[in-house]
């Protein structure tokens, strides 16, 4: 009887923790998109001064930022610094996997960042600032979607997985 009670408690507890983990993934994605918007605003300000190269901007952002994007921007800066890697597109192709692995960003957000960085350095400063502004606006739309996802999907999965755990306990015992 005690083993049954312990198993029931374990199943309900683990199902609750799984639901909580899914909910926190939605919250983390929302937070990471907001961090990315903040980083892009810093890049836009640095570009507007016109005194920094992309390498220096990426290095500064990588140094300032302690979020998941720090490694990506430091790696981009290092790639631009060393001559043997290649063009910006090749460096970006090598490093975009960092965003896919280390963040909860969806492919559409990663594509936004990919397109933006690929176009940086290929035009004048005003065009680059407009591209950054456009990317920020698109990401702000994604933040409203992620906020809805938190309240709808995140809470739904949290409750659903807990009730599935309770249901499994009822069926098994």
Regions found by a protein language model. Give the residues of each.
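Short alpha-helix boundary/capping motifs
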Residues: 25, 64, 71-75, 86, ...
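Bilayer-spanning, highly hydrophobic alpha-helical transmembrane segments
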Residues: 7-18, 145-173
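Juxtamembrane/interface alpha-helical elements of multi-pass membrane proteins
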Residues: 3, 7-81
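Solvent-exposed, charged/polar functional surfaces in cytosolic regulatory/catalytic domains
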Residues: 42, 98, 138, 142
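Glycine- and small-hydrophobic-enriched helix-loop-helix hairpins
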Residues: 46, 51-126
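Membrane-interface, cytosolic juxtamembrane amphipathic helix immediately N-terminal to a transmembrane helix
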Residues: 28, 119-162
